[in-house]
Amino acid sequence: MNPNQKIITIGSVSLTIATVCFLMQIAILATTVTLHFKQHKCDSPASNQVMPCEPIIIERNITEIVYLNNTTIEKEICPEVVEYRNWSKPQCQITGFAPFSKDNSIRLSAGGDIWVTREPYVSCDPGKCYQFALGQGTTLDNKHSNGTIHDRIPHRTLLMNELGVPFHLGTKQVCVAWSSSSCHDGKAWLHVCVTGDDRNATASFIYDGRLVDSIGSWSQNILRTQESECVCINGTCTVVMTDGSASGRADTRILFIKEGKIVHIGPLSGSAQHIEECSCYPRYPDVRCICRDNWKGSNRPVIDINMEDYSIDSSYVCSGLVGDTPRNDDSSSNSNCRDPNNERGNPGVKGWAFDNGDDVWMGRTISKDLRSGYETFKVIGGWSTPNSKSQVNRQVIVDNNNWSGYSGIFSVEGKSCINRCFYVELIRGRPQETRVWWTSNSIVVFCGTSGTYGTGSWPDGANINFMPI
């Protein structure tokens, strides 16, 4: 083969190889582009059912990176379906309560910018717990804190922080409110926020960050609500509201709300005579509330709310060891399950209890006269037997040498059961501590445990002499 033929042969082979390589590169490029764009659409399932992903050509931001033969392929991951909460798991069986959180707001106020608050509570979304309180529109080390013993001013707002984070200057003000309730339906937060004139207040219903509905005062006498979490089952939330006398007959109504819109309002029925500041918890498929009778009884009213047909019944906790303050000595206190006991019914304090079969777990101040100290215990037969007084599993949360205040319940869904937790408001300043001109609080939080536990006392802990006046 002469030199010219060799050159032609080598050139032909090289051209053939180059052509094959070029075609392979085109094929690889086409495959890569096809895999990149041929992703999957996750259709919104009907009736909250999980549906398979259908193929569609679409760009998404949610991607998973897979390395295959040095080629980067992006494919969509179908997002998890968000469902309404139904609280259908059983209640956890507990032996008592263990410490969970404490925010130390008053101690921190001695040297930092912390909001003046009262009426705190705790509520959780499916992944995290938050603390709420009604702020007074001022920090503690601020002349505006003078006179914050007053409950209802137009500057009060509902504050919301992750549980354990004190209400610092960066805290979100969720709404304008001097009375409130909040709950998460599994998809978004609902906030019920009451503000305005005593004789003509407004309740705003804020869902997923938007004002959806409102209702005005129906008795022109301080429309007010729970000061703790509401409860949502299968997308419908319920909240208890009262308008009328704080020491006489009032008009209590139970509101049912769907994604912020009022869908039904029911009047209180049953034997409860006066309802204030209910502490509610899910008791699937219904909701149960333990409230404050500020008129006739130191035994606590119970409201049972049927979430399917909106029917309502009420009664009183059977335990003869009653939960309100002030109250009679335990040896002379009574409850017949149906009626107020007419024992030191006025004024009262917000509190909680929850049923456990025939028994009842409850918390109350240690003092029968003042908002000082705090204890929890179980009363055997306290849910079913009139005037039952057999107390077990008593724990001191705050010793009787320190101030307490309101308390309330919140529920946390675990893997196999629903746990009950509670918070205690630790009030400092006026009216008891007159060296200062302000009134504010910190909180301590406990949750039910099936384990063992020790003893202690968890007061606010601030030295009033270190505090701004």
Swiss-Prot record:
List the residue ranges of the region (Head of neuraminidase).
Answer: 91-469
What positions does the entry give for Ca(2+) binding?
D293, G297, D324
Q: What is its main location?
A: virion
Positions in the Virion surface compartment: 30-469
Swiss-Prot/TrEMBL keywords: Calcium, Disulfide bond, Glycoprotein, Glycosidase, Host cell membrane, Host membrane, Hydrolase, Membrane, Metal-binding, Signal-anchor, Transmembrane, Transmembrane helix, Virion
Paired cysteines (S-S): C92-C417, C124-C129, C183-C230, C232-C237, C278-C291, C280-C289, C318-C337, C421-C447
The positions annotated for binding substrate are R118, R152, E276, E277, R292, R371
Any coiled-coil ranges, and where?
Answer: none
Q: Which family does it belong to?
A: Belongs to the glycosyl hydrolase 34 family.
Q: What is this protein called?
A: Neuraminidase
UniProt organism field: Influenza A virus (strain A/Japan/305/1957 H2N2)
- The record's gene field reads NA
